[in-house]
Every structure is written in C-alpha cells, then in structure tokens.
C-alpha cells in the first residue's frame, strides 16, 4: 500500500526547503553527517544484537580506549560499518550486484574473511526466527530481479520503491552474515543517489521494524516498511533543516515545559513526524521557536 498523499506532500515540502537552505553549506552538512555516524553505527549494530553502547561505539570510532569487556569482533564491527557508511556517503554510487558485494567485503573484513564479499554458496542456509531464506541457488537470479524491478519502476513513489527493495533483499538474505547492516546501508545509498540525506533505523523500534518483514513474508504487505522509510526520511530532513536555519535546538521535553503543554502529545506527534522533531542520541529535539499550532495534536 503506497504512502498516502499527505505524507508525500510533507516530504516534498521538506525536500524543497532543504534544497534551498543547503546551498553554500556543504561543510555544515558534512559536520552533521560525521557527527551522526556513531549513532547510526550503534543503532544498526544494536539491531543485530551487538552489546556495544552508544558511548562505547563513539570511543571506538574516535580510537579511544574502551573496556576490556568489549570484544575484538565488536570493535571491528563498529569500525567496519563506519567505513561502509563513509564509502556510501562519498559519492552517488549506483546500486548493483558489484557494489553490494563490495560493501559486504568492507563490512566483514577482519571478522569473517572467508565469507566477506561472497553470497551464500551451496549448502549454506540461513534461518531468521521461523523463516528460512531461499536456497543459495536462487540468490543471483532473485537479487537480479529485485535490482531490475527497482531500477525500472518509474511509477512507484521513491520511499515505496526503497521499502520494497529492502523487504526483498532481507527476505532473500543473500549472505551468511551481515544482511541487515548491508540492507540498511543500501537504503542510504538509494536515498543519497536521488539527493536525500541518510536515515537511521532505530534499535528501540526494532520490534516494529521486524514486524514489517513478517507482514511481507506472510501477506506481501509492504505498508509497515513504507511507513518506516517515509518517517525516517522526514526525520532526517527535519534535523538538517533545523541546523541549516541556525535554529536554537532544544529537547522536546523542555519545549513542552516552556509552553506548559503535555509532553506525551508532542512525543506522539514527533513519532508520527507531524511536527519538525528529530532525535539525537535517542533524545527528541526541536527548534525552540517552533510554533505551528495544531500539528502536535
């Protein structure tokens, strides 16, 4: 079920504003992207059950000393994923079989070198909960079909296309390990290619995210993932436009307190992205001067 017109109109309006504001501010946008990498790395790895905290992830990426309890594997997982993110953000790469394999090799180097940059081979099966992914013999053809569908579909709305490809990719699970992290990087590759900023899929919303795959595998229902991608795009645009405007950014809780209004109502609106709120390190924030009456209701 495609994203509805009101959401499309909000994204269109936000993108137009973003495009106008970003002119001549490449250095600020780069700062935002770089500051966001630890949070993005933390969330994507946490979805895959990494035990690293956000603070530990930040220390690893800054080459600072971390607790002896942190495994070498998790150190490489953080560093490698950050490297993949930097590569994705370095240019408008076309999504292809070759690029997907390259990203996977970068992700698993020094972790699982024997499978890095390789699709599952004969006899290599994967199970996600009760779902068993297609046999290795079907990977090349199925991925090729998904890539062709994505590149040739000129009718579907862009967030719907990205959601469908993500569902197809994760349902296929072409790798022995690293499928989720690569899949989420592909989302950002696709967004950057068409001029949108990168997004973060949040670990705290993991259950809802996983429910999107179940809905697709059980009933070919794409609605949940379409909603997740669209709201993530709006949140990313809200964050960047706030910084590009030079706004004084405060916590949403403080904003609600300042105007003596109910915080739960604002949090609900933030989650729906009907107010220009965004998260940093898991905390909802907003422009202090935001005053669009009614949008928080």
Predicted regions located by residue number:
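FIC/Doc superfamily catalytic core
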Residues: 1-177, 181-297
């Amino acid at each position: 079920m495609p994203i509805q017109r009101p959401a499309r109109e909000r994204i269109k309006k936000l993108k137009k504003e973003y495009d106008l504001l970003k002119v001549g501010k490449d250095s600020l946008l780069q700062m935002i992207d770089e500051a966001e990498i630890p949070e993005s790395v933390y969330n994507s790895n946490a979805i895959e059950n990494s035990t690293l905290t956000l603070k530990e992830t930040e220390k690893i990426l800054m080459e600072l000393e971390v607790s002896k309890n942190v495994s070498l594997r998790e150190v490489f997982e953080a560093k490698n994923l950050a490297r993949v993110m930097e590569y994705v953000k370095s240019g408008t790469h076309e999504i292809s079989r070759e690029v997907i394999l390259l990203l996977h090799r970068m992700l698993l180097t020094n972790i699982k070198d024997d499978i890095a940059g390789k699709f599952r081979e004969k006899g290599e099966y994967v199970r996600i909960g009760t779902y068993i992914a297609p046999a290795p013999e079907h990977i090349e053809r199925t991925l090729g079909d998904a890539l062709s569908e994505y590149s040739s579909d000129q009718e579907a709305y862009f967030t719907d296309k990205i959601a469908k490809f993500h569902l197809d990719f994760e349902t296929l699970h072409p790798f022995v390990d690293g499928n989720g992290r690569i899949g989420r990087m592909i989302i950002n590759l696709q967004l950057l290619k068409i001029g949108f900023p990168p997004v973060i899929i949040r670990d705290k919303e993991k259950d809802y995210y996983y429910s999107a795959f179940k809905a697709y595998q059980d009933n070919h229902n794409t609605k949940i993932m379409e909603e997740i991608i669209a709201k993530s795009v709006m949140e990313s645009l809200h964050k960047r436009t706030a910084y590009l405007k030079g706004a004084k950014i405060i916590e949403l809780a403080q904003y609600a307190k300042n105007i003596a209004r109910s915080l739960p109502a604002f949090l609900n609106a933030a989650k729906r992205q009907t107010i220009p709120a965004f998260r940093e390190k898991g905390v909802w924030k907003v422009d202090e001067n935001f005053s669009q009456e009614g949008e928080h209701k």
